[in-house]
Amino acid sequence: MSNLWRNLKSVRLPFRRAPTLPLYNVPVRRSISSSSSIPPSSSPPPRLTITQRVKELTKKYGWWSLGVYIGISVLDFSASFVLVRTLGAERIGYLEHSILNSIRRYFNWEIPESTASGEPEAYHSSIWTELAFAYGIHKALVVARVPLTAAIVPPLAKRFRGPRIRP
């Protein structure tokens, strides 16, 4: 009889299952209760400064954001310079002339004599003064360059990176 019992133990019958612990058979279900959830904050997140926005954009999109920002900056500065050169060369020349004369008077330097005839003096600004004015306008437009960069970079990066790579 002992041989028969050993043979029956070694035979695997279809109705016989391996023993399992009841803990592993029960599916784990977690309920979401209102007490464990994070309460919604009543205050909106703080607004980021321009520098923080640029850093965040650079972290997310890398060289794409830097390239777009530099491209917009080049266009912005060149447009500012063209506007200063065409629209305000004589006005800037007058300002430059009056500022330089004030400095010369302050330090008792020799002031160049104006034209002897009764013709009005033509004021010509130097290229460096025009560049300085264009740079001032360019710096004032930083509040427009950053949002424009933030609007252009995501679709541009998505288009050129391809559909499989997330930005």
UniProtKB/Swiss-Prot annotation:
Q: Which GO terms describe its biological process?
A: protein maturation
Instruction: List all membrane-crossing ranges.
Output: none
Q: Which InterPro entries match?
A: FAM210A/B-like (IPR045866), FAM210A/B-like_dom (IPR009688)
Q: Record's superkingdom?
A: Eukaryota
Checking Pfam families in the record gives: FAM210A-B_dom
What's a single GO CC term here?
mitochondrion
Name the family the entry cites: To A.thaliana At2g20940.
Instruction: Report the protein name in the record.
Output: Uncharacterized protein C106.07c
